[in-house]
């Protein structure tokens, strides 16, 4: 079953969600010989936000749901190249230290992916995302963001490797009269799995993000840069030929000026 990639963050808990940390097993194992088809994916993340790197945390916990529709299509002039376009809608709920909570729609995303298979068991791809500030006021980043990432998958027998490296270019945010320059993000993610028998395909993960410093454009105050590295463990389930699921636990092991990752991820993918 082909995997599909996505990334999503939101303002109140952005620091606790590493970009592309939602990638699971076979995420970038994409076909090049196919008739057009569709995939629905649901990514669900619960994070304990009570701890932070290098300072107090402002939250208790957060729940993020990312729902994506992806359409695979072909270009006749490029028979050995695969393409898909994708749309993401979702919601977030964040509980703060004072027991107040905010919830609503995250900023929608639209994207496109193109890929080739240099070898029968090796995929390389490029993905572009546009983030538009149409989410609810207390959830939105209030900025137009763009990201681009290199993606790869390699399989050898029961062994599967997925990885990516990318950059997210974050626009200036405008909210409640405050204009803020936000630092860009660099990120990388690795996933390594081994299939013993059907539905027993454990995997380990390594996720990393580094955010550049920003600035309050009104006061001139600097917003500190931040970074985090997290590791995870989970299992991939091939439930049917059209339905798959991944579940894993991800925990931050090093970081700075950031909410500590302490999260459970659950992913479903359905082909139709």
PLM features per residue range, with description:
Residues 54, 138, 175, 216, ...:
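Outer-membrane beta-barrel and related beta-rich outer-membrane complex signature
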Residues 2-12:
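C-terminal segment of classical bacterial N-terminal signal peptides
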Residues 14-132, 146-170, 185-187, 191, ...:
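Transmembrane beta-barrel domains of Gram-negative outer membranes and organellar outer membranes
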